[in-house]
Regions:
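Non-catalytic nucleic-acid substrate-recognition regions in nucleic-acid-modifying enzymes
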Residues: 10
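Catalytic cores of DNA base-excision repair glycosylases
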Residues: 2-4, 13-199, 205-208, 213-214
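N-terminal strand-loop-strand
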Residues: 213-248
Length: 248
């Protein structure tokens, strides 16, 4: 019952406050699936505000998955220019080609097949299933993680490990509006439960937020040590251009 109430509050807030984003347009199911695929690739490691103009330009020039599968690399990379992480663009095209060849041009609507696509990991697969196919998945991005950590007041390092957060997110429950609900949770983290200075007075679920009750909004960082790796590189220069090659 509590989960249903939580879901209702978040969706009611979303209906009134959601941002108007180009990939949220009321379009055909096929277009929505394509828009979701493109936007999720672009949003990997890039903020929403930065992505919007690139997404609009990309869709204007490559409006369908079929065209994406056949686009010349030069044109593709030109459209991606300025967005960075060009491997995303290359993987996006490879994904379009794989979908065209192996799935009859239709983006798969199950987790295992999505994970088989180039550049699609656990998060992207969950996001596509929720947003494009209205399936009951909650993709655990940085925004939703933050809401979860604060709402449950997760402070211990073992509590904020990814595996534990995946289990804890069940507190959010499910909705028949899975597409909207996944985006609502993302919006809540992006617009209200910000990394600093969260807008608790505007939060639809603040009443039961443990961090608000304790007046402690600091987030415990995952202190899992990263391993530094070092490589020797060969540098070649020609006509003011540089080429770096890993020395194996």
């Amino acid at each position: 019952m509590k989960e249903q109430l939580l879901t209702k509050k978040i969706l009611n807030w979303y209906d009134l406050n959601k941002r108007s984003l180009p990939w949220r347009k009321n379009v055909s199911l096929q277009k929505r699936q394509y828009y979701t695929l493109v936007s999720e690739f672009m949003l990997q490691q890039t903020q929403v505000a930065t992505v919007i103009p690139f997404f609009n330009r990309f869709i204007k020039n490559i409006p369908t998955l079929k065209l994406l599968a056949k686009v010349q690399n030069k044109k593709l990379l030109k459209l991606w220019e300025g967005l960075g992480y060009y491997s995303r663009a290359k993987n996006l095209k490879k994904t379009a080609q794989t979908v065209t060849k192996n799935f009859k041009g239709k983006i798969p609507n199950n987790y295992e097949d999505l994970l088989s696509l180039p550049g699609v990991g656990n998060y992207t697969a969950s996001a596509i299933l929720a947003i494009a196919f209205n399936k009951p998945y909650i993709p655990l991005d940085g925004n939703i993680e933050r809401v979860l950590k604060r709402y449950l007041y997760l402070k211990k390092e073992k509590d904020i490990q990814k595996d534990n957060l995946i289990k804890k997110k069940s507190i959010f429950g499910t909705s028949s509006r899975s597409s909207d609900y996944a985006q609502a949770l993302m919006e809540l983290g992006a617009l209200i439960c910000k990394p600093t200075n969260p807008l608790c007075n505007q939060c639809p679920i603040s009443k039961n937020c443990k961090s608000l009750q304790k007046k402690d909004f600091n987030l415990t960082k995952n202190n899992k040590k990263n391993i530094d790796k070092y490589f020797l590189l060969k540098v070649y220069k020609k006509d003011q251009r540089y080429l770096l090659i890993k020395n194996t």
